[in-house]
Protein backbone atom coordinates (compact mmCIF):
# COMPACT_ATOMS: atom_id res chain seq x y z
CA UNK A 1 0.00 0.00 0.00
CA UNK A 2 1.34 3.44 -0.88
CA UNK A 3 1.19 6.47 1.39
CA UNK A 4 -1.53 7.94 -0.84
CA UNK A 5 -3.72 4.85 -0.44
CA UNK A 6 -3.35 4.90 3.33
CA UNK A 7 -4.97 8.34 3.51
CA UNK A 8 -8.30 7.09 2.16
CA UNK A 9 -10.79 6.50 4.98
CA UNK A 10 -13.64 4.06 4.45
CA UNK A 11 -16.78 5.62 5.94
CA UNK A 12 -19.25 3.94 8.25
CA UNK A 13 -22.81 3.63 7.02
CA UNK A 14 -23.85 6.27 9.55
CA UNK A 15 -21.18 8.68 8.28
CA UNK A 16 -22.33 8.04 4.70
CA UNK A 17 -25.91 9.04 5.54
CA UNK A 18 -24.72 12.12 7.43
CA UNK A 19 -22.75 13.26 4.38
CA UNK A 20 -25.60 12.45 1.98
CA UNK A 21 -27.78 14.84 3.98
CA UNK A 22 -25.30 17.68 3.35
CA UNK A 23 -25.63 17.46 -0.43
CA UNK A 24 -28.64 17.75 -2.69
CA UNK A 25 -27.26 16.77 -6.09
CA UNK A 26 -25.99 13.36 -7.10
CA UNK A 27 -25.63 11.11 -10.12
CA UNK A 28 -28.09 8.30 -10.72
CA UNK A 29 -26.67 5.29 -12.59
CA UNK A 30 -29.24 3.12 -14.36
CA UNK A 31 -29.28 0.41 -17.00
CA UNK A 32 -30.90 1.63 -20.25
CA UNK A 33 -31.61 -1.14 -22.78
CA UNK A 34 -28.09 -2.52 -23.38
CA UNK A 35 -25.87 0.04 -21.66
CA UNK A 36 -25.39 2.00 -18.43
CA UNK A 37 -26.33 5.66 -18.28
CA UNK A 38 -25.91 8.39 -15.68
CA UNK A 39 -28.26 11.26 -14.87
CA UNK A 40 -27.76 14.17 -12.48
CA UNK A 41 -30.57 14.38 -9.94
CA UNK A 42 -31.63 16.49 -7.01
CA UNK A 43 -32.37 14.24 -4.06
CA UNK A 44 -33.32 14.21 -0.39
CA UNK A 45 -32.64 11.64 2.32
CA UNK A 46 -35.85 10.27 3.83
CA UNK A 47 -35.84 7.68 6.65
CA UNK A 48 -32.86 5.67 5.39
CA UNK A 49 -33.83 5.97 1.73
CA UNK A 50 -33.11 8.47 -1.05
CA UNK A 51 -35.96 10.23 -2.84
CA UNK A 52 -35.86 12.18 -6.09
CA UNK A 53 -38.50 13.66 -8.33
CA UNK A 54 -38.58 13.64 -12.09
CA UNK A 55 -40.78 13.75 -15.11
CA UNK A 56 -41.62 10.74 -17.25
CA UNK A 57 -38.74 9.71 -19.49
CA UNK A 58 -35.70 7.49 -19.92
CA UNK A 59 -34.39 8.03 -16.39
CA UNK A 60 -37.65 7.06 -14.68
CA UNK A 61 -38.35 4.15 -17.03
CA UNK A 62 -34.87 2.72 -16.48
CA UNK A 63 -35.01 3.29 -12.71
CA UNK A 64 -38.35 1.49 -12.45
CA UNK A 65 -37.14 -1.54 -14.41
CA UNK A 66 -36.03 -4.67 -12.57
CA UNK A 67 -32.37 -3.59 -12.66
CA UNK A 68 -30.77 -2.16 -9.53
CA UNK A 69 -29.58 1.45 -9.55
CA UNK A 70 -26.74 3.37 -7.93
CA UNK A 71 -26.59 6.94 -6.65
CA UNK A 72 -23.25 8.69 -6.17
CA UNK A 73 -22.88 11.99 -4.36
CA UNK A 74 -19.74 13.79 -3.31
CA UNK A 75 -18.55 16.91 -1.63
CA UNK A 76 -15.64 18.88 -0.26
CA UNK A 77 -14.98 20.21 3.23
CA UNK A 78 -13.08 23.50 2.96
CA UNK A 79 -12.10 23.44 6.63
CA UNK A 80 -10.39 20.05 6.46
CA UNK A 81 -9.54 20.15 2.71
CA UNK A 82 -10.98 16.66 2.45
CA UNK A 83 -13.30 15.32 -0.22
CA UNK A 84 -15.84 12.54 0.17
CA UNK A 85 -17.81 10.23 -2.07
CA UNK A 86 -20.80 8.08 -1.12
CA UNK A 87 -22.48 5.39 -3.24
CA UNK A 88 -25.94 4.01 -2.49
CA UNK A 89 -26.93 0.88 -4.42
CA UNK A 90 -30.42 -0.53 -4.37
CA UNK A 91 -33.82 -0.94 -5.93
CA UNK A 92 -36.47 1.67 -6.57
CA UNK A 93 -40.16 2.16 -6.15
CA UNK A 94 -42.45 4.92 -7.27
CA UNK A 95 -44.17 6.79 -4.47
CA UNK A 96 -47.82 7.04 -5.40
CA UNK A 97 -49.94 6.17 -2.37
CA UNK A 98 -51.85 8.87 -0.47
CA UNK A 99 -50.03 9.62 2.78
CA UNK A 100 -46.62 8.49 1.46
CA UNK A 101 -46.97 10.92 -1.43
CA UNK A 102 -48.14 13.75 0.83
CA UNK A 103 -45.18 13.19 3.17
CA UNK A 104 -42.78 13.16 0.22
CA UNK A 105 -44.09 16.41 -1.22
CA UNK A 106 -42.80 18.16 1.91
CA UNK A 107 -39.21 17.00 1.31
CA UNK A 108 -36.73 19.69 0.18
CA UNK A 109 -36.58 18.55 -3.45
CA UNK A 110 -35.81 21.44 -5.78
CA UNK A 111 -35.08 20.31 -9.35
CA UNK A 112 -32.76 22.58 -11.31
CA UNK A 113 -34.44 21.91 -14.64
CA UNK A 114 -37.86 23.36 -15.38
CA UNK A 115 -40.75 21.18 -16.44
CA UNK A 116 -43.09 18.58 -15.03
CA UNK A 117 -41.44 16.77 -12.13
CA UNK A 118 -44.53 15.11 -10.70
CA UNK A 119 -43.11 11.60 -10.24
CA UNK A 120 -41.46 10.76 -6.92
CA UNK A 121 -39.00 7.86 -6.89
CA UNK A 122 -37.51 6.20 -3.79
CA UNK A 123 -34.19 4.33 -3.78
CA UNK A 124 -34.30 1.55 -1.18
CA UNK A 125 -30.66 0.80 -0.36
CA UNK A 126 -29.15 -2.66 -0.38
CA UNK A 127 -25.62 -1.30 0.22
CA UNK A 128 -24.20 2.06 1.23
CA UNK A 129 -20.49 2.80 1.09
CA UNK A 130 -18.24 5.80 1.06
CA UNK A 131 -14.79 7.17 1.50
CA UNK A 132 -13.08 10.37 2.55
CA UNK A 133 -9.66 11.50 1.38
CA UNK A 134 -7.48 14.61 1.50
CA UNK A 135 -7.32 16.74 -1.62
CA UNK A 136 -3.86 16.51 -3.15
CA UNK A 137 -1.83 19.70 -3.18
CA UNK A 138 -1.66 20.88 -6.82
CA UNK A 139 2.14 20.98 -6.58
CA UNK A 140 2.04 17.17 -6.46
CA UNK A 141 0.38 16.79 -9.83
CA UNK A 142 1.14 20.03 -11.69
CA UNK A 143 3.97 19.81 -14.19
CA UNK A 144 6.15 22.64 -15.49
CA UNK A 145 4.04 22.58 -18.67
CA UNK A 146 0.63 22.70 -16.96
CA UNK A 147 0.21 26.42 -17.56
CA UNK A 148 1.62 26.53 -21.08
CA UNK A 149 -0.78 27.94 -23.68
CA UNK A 150 -1.74 25.27 -26.17
CA UNK A 151 -2.59 25.45 -29.84
CA UNK A 152 -6.32 25.56 -30.52
CA UNK A 153 -6.36 22.09 -32.11
CA UNK A 154 -4.93 20.34 -29.02
Range-by-range predicted roles:
Residues 2-4, 81-83, 100-154:
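C-terminal edge-of-domain segments
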Amino acid sequence: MTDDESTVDELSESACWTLLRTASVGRLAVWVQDHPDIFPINYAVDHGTVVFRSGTGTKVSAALSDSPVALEADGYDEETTEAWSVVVKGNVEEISRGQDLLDTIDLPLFPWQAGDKSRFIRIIPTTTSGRRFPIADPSLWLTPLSGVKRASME
